[in-house]
């Protein structure tokens, strides 16, 4: 719009809520010199524009959703969330304000705060979401469980009793989705419906309503085309309703009169005019074509004229304009046009000159509906001439976004004046000169020059504030895009190397350390970045430690612990070490094996969410239409490594103790002073009486063995242990992951004695044997690995660790195509049958243990141990 200019004056500052806009809708009304304002909280402010003073503040029980002023009755109607409609008499404002000032002379605020009495609630209803008031009637819209309900009441006055008696009629509208929340206080709807009243041209005009208060008069042609013959003949006002689902419907007011027990039929009373497919934010009317008297210069300024165009705006900017136009056949038809304006729309207003003002989070714009494609022709009857513009071009007014707008009367200079509540909580007036074609230089007085400079400085500060906000938002988004690009590169680098050397790798090593007077098994995870990328914000190293169940608890399950360590600025060539204790616990127990898994996690919510979140909390409600679209897992998970820590890795050796002067200490809780004293007082040469010592002295050690083909071992160990005796090489291979393996490497050993985490001995012996009766070609050379320990649990853990290594070796050799020698199948079948018989005996003995007494169970347990020993020493060989 060429030549549009504005002058902004700041009147006062108010506090705006940080919550959603639909939960408390800001509202601004003006009548004469008084401005009635709500910021969406529980306060209604009364501001004297001429005096520049805040005269009173009304405090309601909950958030204020809507205001409407009935000036001819000197009454202000207020919709309070989850409470109902209140009616305040403006005549008592001065008296209430004076009394409040006398009672609170020493109060901090310079204005009186008037707590609204509950008796002022003239229509209590927690489901009310919108209303409009006429001279003698009150129309409400309530949200039911499944549908909207429109109700018509006799208009209540201030000081009257609540109105269950005054209902005249009701009708149900379309379906709705009720908000959530607890039953006592349900959540507020995100968008509130919009109600307004349309009067026919020959009816009693709404003189008691200020402009922009939801009541207007349409020309006869448009009124009849929209609402039908019945509304025209009845000369009935029509209630227009814009719903959050996008429906624009109407109800003829005089047809709504029904009995209290028989609501009206929606199919007859409710007419759907259009569907915007987005929440309706504003409904208004304007003059799109000049009136004949106005064109001739006979219409006086301020004289009442009827509107010829109905306008509705949706939240995302979809705009509907309806006007009566001539068809090609010469008949009057309703012309409907949809436009797309910048969104999301926060609020809107229109004047009688064909201008629509709408506010977005970044700007306040105006569009002109009088710019038609065809020129105005005064020879057409009824003033229904011409058409609507095909395209609307919004013009920026260079004003920050507004939460509420009100078009006041035209200023004496001929410019339009807007009253607005900015997103920062400032009440401002905007004098708009929308018809000036070009600025005309003129001499300026000194006083006017100072005022002009002040206005320019305010505009510069306003624009600077907007630029700062936009720059901060752009910087955050650029940072997020850079981080996402790095994350994509890291993900591709890791996923393209599923095996082998990775550009970003994590290694796990274990070692024994002295911690709090106890020997602790520590795991060190080293994250090394060998790539050309950096791990910055959003990256987390996750380490999961999964312990196995106790060997003595058959029904027990292991426990899992996950540690998360933020990775902060791990650049190329850098490494990060994390050390975690694995055990033993305070009771001295270390349940092996322990499985450790490491992975990198990239949090999309931390990086992208911070970029999409508004920098200014006051802007938060207006970005709700762009929700954070993230996957359900909220991030990217990249596995790095997995390692199992078993008994062979946890064995300690006397020659490799951390402190050479002492042998490894038995882990467990620190000895109590009394126990220490008794041990020191024990006579020299006396035997210890602990459970472990007694078990080692009187019970034979538990043993298990496994035989592996010598050829299979030579093929698997020829590269890493060539030049060593096969038994020594096998022992080195079994203990290769032990931190104290240097003890084995220092000399050629075929057997070694280690110390388990609980302090008991574990002996490993490797020797060569010849297995006969298995192959028709002759004896098979094999290596027998024997485990011996006084602790049955530790023997089982070591045996399990050996089997796990041999299984991996056999799988790798099978993939290379190695084939076993010929075997005697009858001999193998006999061994298999013997094992099946032993397993059946084990099951029978275990069932027998459940029913025997303590004395008999000892004998059964001995039989079980004997059978377990036979099972752990099979006659088979792994080939």
Swiss-Prot record:
GO molecular function per UniProt: DNA binding
Record carries keyword DNA-binding: yes
Main localization (coarse): nucleus
GO CC, one annotated term: cytosol
Keywords, ordered alphabetically: DNA damage, DNA repair, DNA-binding, Nucleus
Subcellular compartments: Nucleus
The keyword RNA-binding appears for this protein: no
GO biological process: interstrand cross-link repair
Its job: Plays a role in Fanconi anemia-associated DNA damage response network. Regulates FANCD2 monoubiquitination and the stability of the FA core complex. Induces chromosomal instability as well as hypersensitivity to DNA cross-linking agents, when repressed.
Listed PANTHER family: FANCONI ANEMIA CORE COMPLEX-ASSOCIATED PROTEIN 100
Known partners and oligomeric status: Belongs to the multisubunit FA complex composed of FANCA, FANCB, FANCC, FANCE, FANCF, FANCG, FANCL/PHF9, FANCM, FAAP24 and FAAP100. Forms a subcomplex with FANCB and FANCL.
Protein name (database record): Fanconi anemia core complex-associated protein 100
Organism: Mus musculus (Mouse)
Gene responsible for this protein: Faap100
């Amino acid at each position: 719009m060429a030549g549009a200019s504005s002058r902004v004056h700041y009147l006062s500052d108010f506090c705006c809520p940080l919550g959603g806009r639909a939960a408390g809708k800001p509202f601004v009304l003006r009548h004469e010199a008084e401005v009635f304002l709500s910021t969406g909280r529980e306060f209604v402010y009364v501001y004297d524009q001429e005096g520049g003073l805040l005269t009173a503040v009304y405090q309601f029980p909950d958030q204020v959703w809507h205001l409407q002023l009935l000036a001819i009755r000197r009454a202000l109607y207020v919709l309070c969330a989850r409470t109902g409609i209140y009616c305040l008499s403006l005549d008592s404002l001065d008296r209430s304000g004076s009394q409040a000032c006398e009672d609170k002379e020493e109060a901090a605020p310079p204005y009186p705060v008037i707590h609204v009495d509950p008796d002022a609630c003239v229509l209590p209803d927690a489901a009310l979401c919108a209303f409009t008031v006429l001279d003698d009637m009150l129309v409400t819209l309530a949200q039911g469980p499944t549908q909207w309900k429109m109700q018509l009441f006799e208009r209540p006055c201030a000081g009257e009793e609540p109105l269950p008696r005054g209902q005249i009629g009701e009708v149900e509208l379309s379906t709705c989705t009720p908000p959530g929340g607890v039953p006592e206080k349900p959540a507020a709807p995100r968008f509130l419906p919009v109600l307004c009243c349309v009067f026919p041209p020959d009816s009693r005009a709404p003189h008691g309503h200020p402009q922009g208060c939801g009541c207007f008069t349409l020309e006869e042609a448009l009124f009849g085309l929209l609402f039908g013959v019945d509304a025209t003949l009845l000369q009935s006002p029509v209630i227009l309703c814009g719903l959050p689902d996008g429906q624009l419907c109407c109800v003829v007011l005089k047809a709504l009169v029904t009995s209290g027990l028989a609501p009206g039929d929606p199919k007859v009373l409710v007419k759907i005019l259009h569907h915007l497919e987005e929440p309706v934010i504003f409904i208004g009317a304007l003059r799109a074509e000049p009136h004949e008297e106005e064109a001739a210069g006979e219409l006086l300024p301020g004289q009442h004229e009827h509107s010829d165009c109905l306008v509705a705006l949706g939240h995302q900017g979809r705009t509907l304009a309806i006007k009566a136009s001539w068809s090609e056949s010469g008949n009057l038809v309703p012309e409907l046009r949809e436009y797309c304006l910048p969104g999301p729309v926060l609020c809107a207003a229109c004047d009688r000159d064909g201008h629509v003002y709408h506010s977005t989070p970044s700007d306040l714009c105006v569009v002109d509906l009088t710019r038609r494609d065809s020129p105005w022709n005064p020879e057409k009857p009824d003033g229904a001439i011409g058409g609507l513009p095909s395209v609307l071009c919004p013009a920026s007014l260079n004003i920050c976004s507004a939460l509420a707008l009100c078009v006041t009367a035209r200023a004496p200079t001929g410019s339009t004046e807007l009253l607005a509540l900015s997103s920062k909580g400032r009440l401002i007036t905007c004098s708009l000169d929308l018809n000036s074609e070009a600025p005309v230089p003129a001499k300026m007085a000194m006083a006017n020059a100072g005022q002009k400079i002040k206005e320019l400085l305010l505009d510069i500060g306003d624009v600077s504030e907007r630029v700062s906000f936009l720059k901060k938002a752009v910087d955050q988004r650029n940072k997020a895009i850079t981080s996402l690009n790095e994350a994509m590169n890291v993900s591709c680098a890791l996923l393209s190397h599923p095996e082998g050397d990775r550009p970003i790798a994590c290694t796990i090593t274990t070692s024994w350390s002295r911690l709090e007077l106890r020997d602790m098994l520590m795991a060190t995870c080293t994250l090394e970045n060998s790539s050309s990328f950096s791990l910055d914000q959003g990256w987390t190293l996750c380490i999961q430690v999964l312990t196995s169940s106790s060997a003595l608890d058959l029904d027990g399950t292991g426990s899992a612990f996950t540690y998360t360590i933020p990775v902060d600025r791990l650049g190329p060539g850098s490494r990060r070490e994390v050390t975690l204790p694995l055990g033993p616990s305070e009771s001295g127990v270390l349940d092996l094996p322990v499985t450790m898994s490491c992975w990198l996690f990239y949090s999309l919510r931390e990086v992208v969410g911070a970029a999409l979140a508004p920098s200014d909390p006051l802007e938060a409600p207006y970005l709700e239409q762009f929700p954070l679209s993230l996957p359900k897992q909220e991030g990217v998970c990249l596995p790095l490594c997995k390692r199992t820590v078993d008994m062979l890795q946890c064995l300690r050796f006397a020659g490799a103790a951390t402190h050479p002067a002492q042998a490894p200490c038995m882990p467990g809780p620190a000895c109590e002073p009394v126990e220490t004293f008794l041990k020191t007082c024990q006579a020299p040469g006396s035997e210890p009486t602990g459970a472990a010592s007694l078990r080692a002295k009187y019970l034979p050690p538990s043993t298990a063995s496994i035989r592996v083909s010598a050829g299979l071992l030579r093929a698997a160990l020829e590269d890493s242990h060539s030049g060593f005796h096969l038994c020594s090489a096998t022992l080195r291979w079994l203990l290769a992951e032990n931190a104290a393996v240097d003890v084995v490497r220092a000399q050629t050993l075929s057997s070694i004695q280690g110390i388990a985490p609980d302090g008991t001995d574990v002996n490993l012996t490797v020797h060569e044997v010849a297995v006969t009766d298995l192959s028709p070609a002759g004896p098979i050379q094999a290596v027998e690995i024997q485990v011996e320990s006084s602790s049955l649990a530790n023997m089982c853990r070591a045996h399990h660790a050996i089997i796990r290594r041999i299984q991996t070796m056999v799988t790798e050799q099978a993939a290379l195509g190695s084939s076993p020698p010929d075997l005697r199948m009858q001999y193998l079948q006999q061994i298999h049958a013997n094992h099946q018989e032993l397993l059946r005996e084990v099951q029978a003995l275990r069932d027998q243990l459940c029913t025997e007494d303590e004395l008999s169970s000892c004998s059964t347990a001995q039989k079980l141990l004997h059978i377990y020993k036979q099972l752990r020493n099979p006659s088979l060989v792994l080939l």
